[in-house]
Amino acid sequence: MKRTKNINQEMFRKEWRTHRLAPVALAVSAVFFLAGCEQTDETVSLYQNADDCSSANPSMAAQCTTAYNNALKEAEKTAPKYATKEDCVAEFGEAQCTQTPAPAQAGMAAESQQGGGMSWMPLMAGYMMGRMMGGGAGFAQQPLFSPKTPASPANGQFVDASGKNYGNATTGRTMTVPKTALAPKPATTSTITRGGFGETVAKQNSMQRSSASSSSSSSRSMGG
């Protein structure tokens, strides 16, 4: 009986250790799992043109040019459009706007859009370049615009077509952004009035500040 009792006690101790370690192992696994899920940021570089990119990355001159040209095409489709040059200049400044075909109205056939007039859009002031989403070997790009008027909430800064702000319009900067920043923006389907894009930028600025504040508060709470 004594031998049986000793064996039972040993088995109990092993089971107790196993049950006690299991939650710890699960907690550690959960931390690594969450860390993997949260890696949704991408390191990107901001350039004003392909030459700036090539100078900073001599071995990637071809990729720099391709990304720049693709960004120009994206800008034509997604940039804010204005019915008049005056409205565009009021938001982006003198010599910062160019004429472009009027945006295709949603739901209308492309043939019916031909000869439908012209509109005005800001010149592309730079572009964002980063790795393709999904970890591919290629690069993704995003056109950037930069208002040159003191009244604009993004004066002298890089913003994308959605109005999201990426800081000073300085070429060669590297920063971390959500991977969604490199996702293609929807094509513009209507013109906006003077001040309309500025309002969009102001809303985005407010959202970015709120998000940064929430992240900071969360970090402080986790830090104890």
UniProtKB/Swiss-Prot annotation:
Checking Pfam families in the record gives:
DUF1190 (PF06693)
Residue ranges for the region (Disordered) are 178-224
Against InterPro entries, the record matches this protein to: Biofilm_formation_YgiB
UniProt biased composition (Low complexity): 209-224
Domain of life according to the entry: Bacteria
Family, per the entry? Belongs to the UPF0441 family.
Protein name in the entry: UPF0441 protein PC1_0312
Native organism is: Pectobacterium carotovorum subsp. carotovorum (strain PC1)
